């Protein structure tokens, strides 16, 4: 069982990396949204304003800064902002979300089920496209999915302590795309707990 699990895990890791990472810089920005996000990271690096940078002389970003921080981090390593470094946060998020899904289901079902789930995630058209784009959606989705996995683990263990890792993921999602990063994972977990006949007000208290 362990050998099969380890082989499947390495297969998913290698497959996810090979499918995503080498191809990020092969095409120019092809939507108005991609350069709009990249220029925010460029402005952060150029002017040192990491909270509310001013773009093109007067425009301010209308999305929270976490995604742009990620672009700026990778671009700082590379030396400049380009298509590859701008798309890398999305690709890394998809790789980590795929691996996280595999590990989550392997512990609760079996290796075969988790392998199928991971491959379906990685090859789903919209998910793959989001992972190849310089947009906030993939980073936001990966953090929310991670939060839901961690909230489920917290429920499994009896809800004794605060789910700090889930809170950290939801904080990152909120810093990526706003309050939906908290609202959606808590709503999904709240509905799940209701299906398990948990006390309604107890759920509200724990999710608040």
Which residues does each PLM region occupy?
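Membrane-integral, polyisoprenol-dependent glycosyltransferases
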Residues: 1-208
